[in-house]
Amino acid sequence: MAISMLQEMPNNTLENYDTVSSKAGIESDPPEGLIFHTAAELEGGGVRIFNVWESREAFERFQEERLLPALREHFGELPPPPEQKITEVHHLVTPSL
């Protein structure tokens, strides 16, 4: 079952996002199971990430194998985890961009 995942990190920056995203290879080597990914600046600062994944397992595999190591490499230790809102997707349309 496809899932959507929303994270809002008011104490983060787009610069940190760009660095960690690059280290995790999100754009250069999209993770297996990723359907859709966006990152945007929150009003007043911070970062919002919205993803759609083929399954919760695909997201958790990416998180363990690529995201957490990239975060450790960038920050030295893991920052407090952001709240994640994960929901099952009822309907998904992906027209060409």
Where are these regions (language model features)?
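Short S/T/G/P-rich N-terminal loop/turn motif that feeds into the first structured element of a domain
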Residues: 1-50, 54-66, 75-97
